[in-house]
Amino acid sequence: MASSNSSGTETLATGFSLTGITDPGELRDTAQALDEAGVGFVSLSGHILSAAAGRYPDRPTPTYASTYRDPFVVFSFLAAHTKRLRFRTAILILPLYPAALVARQTADLAVVSGGRLELGVGISWQQAEYAALGQETRGRGVRMEEQIGVLREFWGGSLISLRGRFHEVDGLGIGEQPPPIPVLIGCGQADPLLERVARIADGWLPLGGISEAGPIERLRKLTADAGRDPGAMRVGSRLAVAPEDPDAWLAGARAQHHIGVTDLTLQPPPGTSRDDALSAVLAAHAAITASPAISPDTEA
């Protein structure tokens, strides 16, 4: 059983981002090593298209010049090669997709993975990607909110009929009720954004991670105000795990756990070799596991 931190939340679940790894064999081998070590989850970006490096000089983070593997395809592949590892989109740009298609894809992935899917969603600022896919950027936040409701209706397994601002469904369904699919929203810390998370999401993925307790405390209060259990709200963040600085791993993990973080993505510095990055992640996970106050819930 997982213990609780000072905020009443579950102990840390550790994870690793696979974004940037494109070779199928390397994806498989990395996922298997993480799975065997008891790491809780892996994540992949949900962007569809790449841009030229340096296209957005006013944006210090990310350039969108990477090759993006489709997370539903990759996770289906990895599900066949792992046993416990959970799969998280971080983040799927939900307004780029038809909600009915995502309902189908996520339900199938939840089934074939044995209930190991977590759907992290967000809206992005990359207007060119929206335009290329025939979608509007205006109103994408409220559209995403409606999409989440539509997804949950489809996941109920029955034929549904609904008419919303952006969606109309007349007596259609996906034909089954998949295992539960947690929905986490990636966004900033403004109160309207946290209020949306509190009302409709199962977790929050703060953009760029988080280092202070204040926003998490606000989120938990908003969650309680919405009539939901604040202790069940998951909160993600990131922890730098430089191979040459293992002493900082536990201190950083303890600090994140203390402010209420529940899900910690272990992140080697840019430029670290693949082998060194994996070794650092596995070593950091082992160190966190060995610390009783912050040991991960490996059953998650």
Segments (PLM) and residue ranges:
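Active-site-adjacent structural elements that line small-molecule/cofactor binding pockets in enzymes
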Residues: 1-300
